Amino acid sequence: MPYIGCHLSSAKGYEAMGRVALSIGANTFQFFTRNPRGSKAKAIDEQDIARFLELARNNGFGTLLAHAPYTLNPCSADPSVARFAAQVLKEDLELMEHLPGNLYNFHPGCHVGQGVEKGIELVADQLNDVLSPEQKTIVLLETMSGKGSEVGRTFEELAAIMERVDLKDKLGVCLDTCHVYSAGYDIVNRLDSVLEHFDAVLGLERLRAIHLNDSMTPFSSFKDRHETIGKGSLGEQAFINIINHPVLRELPFFLETPRDDAGHGEEITWLKEHYRN
């Protein structure tokens, strides 16, 4: 059975997200720990979390994926921006301990003229500051499309960040299908080769989640424009290949396509229909 979900609004709490997930045929989901623009996180509601955890157990939910706010820039040259990112990451990881054993995903950020090497150094330094040996959450670096001065466009850049981090066992990678295709990794025609390269550079054991997104822009465009599954430049067959690939099929899949909950339900149904049991 595949673990497939989508990004859901956390405005009404965890139990509500779980019930929405069930209503659209999902058995996992992604959520923001706070407003995606980075405002203060909501207070923990232990009863809400307890109700959700019971619902998740009773319905066979897979691993959840929390997503950091988009505004975070851990490798900013502005000390105040970097401090804000560190504060949010620390607070979010404390929150995630109430949902033990799940995943937390973030964008490495933009070096904004400092150079990729400096960006890598700053991201790693920040991870060394916020990760703890006791935490039960795996932090995922997301593969990026390479727009502007983004860090994390190549597998080598992600590996360089990890190499500098002390608690490597607390790290993993979330592969975004739109991003890697836009970054020049041909997962449409050469999926096996891309995964072999990932394994050689990072190790497939680091791959912990997949963002399933088609792309509005062509291959190697270095753009980040998500599209509905099968409606973009990747096409339907690419996603059939991805969800059934022996290396990927047991991972949790998360849709971030430009659809509402009902639309995501349609995509989830289609993906399940094409998943080979």
Swiss-Prot record:
Record's protein name: Probable endonuclease 4
One Gene Ontology term of the molecular function aspect: phosphoric diester hydrolase activity
Enzyme Commission no: 3.1.21.2
The organism's taxonomic lineage, starting at the top: Bacteria, Pseudomonadati, Verrucomicrobiota, Verrucomicrobiia, Verrucomicrobiales
Transmembrane regions listed in the UniProt entry: none
Protein family per UniProt: Belongs to the AP endonuclease 2 family.
Protein source organism: Akkermansia muciniphila (strain ATCC BAA-835 / DSM 22959 / JCM 33894 / BCRC 81048 / CCUG 64013 / CIP 107961 / Muc)
Cofactor: Zn(2+)
Enzyme class: hydrolase
